[in-house]
């Protein structure tokens, strides 16, 4: 039997598994079955906690989408990860250093129950996003058979394309998201953000995630939207980001600096399952 915990960050939900005290392995087929909301546990992503690969770090963790694919980064998952390792007694620290397949980051448990995550320095160089473009630009033209889109592009360890929309509530997120997430100019696929700027310190955002469709919240998507908005001269250093599942606060001092994301992480229940 495998012990697991169900958690969510603003409705972006996770199955979190302790791979430090348990010997666990998940095949893509098992992950897809567990992710099924009718026949399994149901989640957007599975988070697997592992011992650190580096003695200077506290943990390593792996992130799997509901379709079984492994991904590089997840902001909402990082907050749940921090709350999980503390709740399970795997650490007694309030400041936790971890690695994922995309790099290292620092997580800080706040007194009010929220978690602040150092999301790292955003990647704007197209070849590293990866995105097919000759040089970094504030905006890019993305052409499809149906229409042309104006977008910003950045990576937070995973690739993001951000579109500016007048009304996020009526945006065709499912249709446009499905169209752009596999666009040929993003060789590894892309998460697609739909950003409505309310004012320079406040945006509304919906995100169509690569491998998971639209989710209630996307932490890396919120960071990417703030980066793109700042670069385009629309946003301040600290921005409130309203997502369908709730609110995040993103702080970015500008190019070459890391982003800091603060938001909630909720425990739902503990369970055990036979694979």
Curated annotation (Swiss-Prot):
Pathway: Amino-acid biosynthesis; L-lysine biosynthesis via DAP pathway; DL-2,6-diaminopimelate from LL-2,6-diaminopimelate: step 1/1
Chief place of localization: cytoplasm
Key word Cytoplasm present: yes
Site residues (Could be important to modulate the pK values of the two catalytic cysteine residues), renumbered to this chain: 160, 209
Enzyme superclass (EC): isomerase
A Pfam family reported for this protein in Swiss-Prot or TrEMBL: DAP_epimerase
Keyword Amino-acid biosynthesis: yes
InterPro entries: DAP_epimerase_AS, DAP_epimerase_DapF
Residue numbers annotated as active site: 74 (proton donor), 218 (proton acceptor)
Protein name per the record: Diaminopimelate epimerase
Species of provenance: Shewanella sp. (strain W3-18-1)
């Amino acid at each position: 039997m495998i012990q697991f915990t169900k958690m969510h960050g603003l409705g972006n939900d996770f199955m979190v598994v302790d791979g430090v005290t348990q010997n666990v392995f998940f095949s893509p087929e098992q992950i897809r079955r567990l992710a099924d909301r009718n026949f399994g546990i149901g989640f957007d992503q599975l988070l697997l906690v592992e011992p650190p690969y580096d003695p200077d770090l506290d943990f390593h963790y792996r992130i799997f989408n509901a379709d079984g694919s492994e991904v590089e980064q997840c902001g909402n998952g990082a907050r749940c990860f921090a709350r999980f390792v503390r709740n399970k007694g795997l650490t007694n620290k309030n400041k936790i250093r971890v690695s994922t397949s995309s790099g290292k980051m620092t997580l800080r448990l706040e007194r009010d129950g929220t978690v602040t995550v150092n999301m790292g320095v955003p990647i704007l160089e197209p070849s590293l996003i990866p995105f097919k473009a000759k040089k970094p630009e504030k905006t890019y033209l993305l052409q499809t058979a149906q229409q042309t889109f104006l977008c910003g592009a950045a990576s937070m360890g995973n690739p993001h394309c951000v579109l500016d929309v007048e009304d996020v509530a009526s945006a065709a997120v499912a249709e446009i998201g499905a169209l752009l997430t596999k666009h040929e100019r993003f060789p590894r696929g892309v998460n697609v953000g739909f950003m409505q700027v309310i004012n320079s310190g406040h945006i509304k955002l919906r995100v169509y995630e690569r491998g998971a469709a639209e989710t209630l919240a996307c932490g890396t998507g919120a960071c990417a939207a703030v980066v793109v908005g700042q670069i385009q001269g629309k946003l301040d250093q600290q921005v409130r980001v309203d997502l369908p599942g709730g609110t995040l606060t993103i702080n970015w001092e500008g190019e070459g600096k890391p982003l800091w994301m603060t938001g909630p992480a909720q425990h739902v229940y503990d369970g055990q399952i036979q694979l």
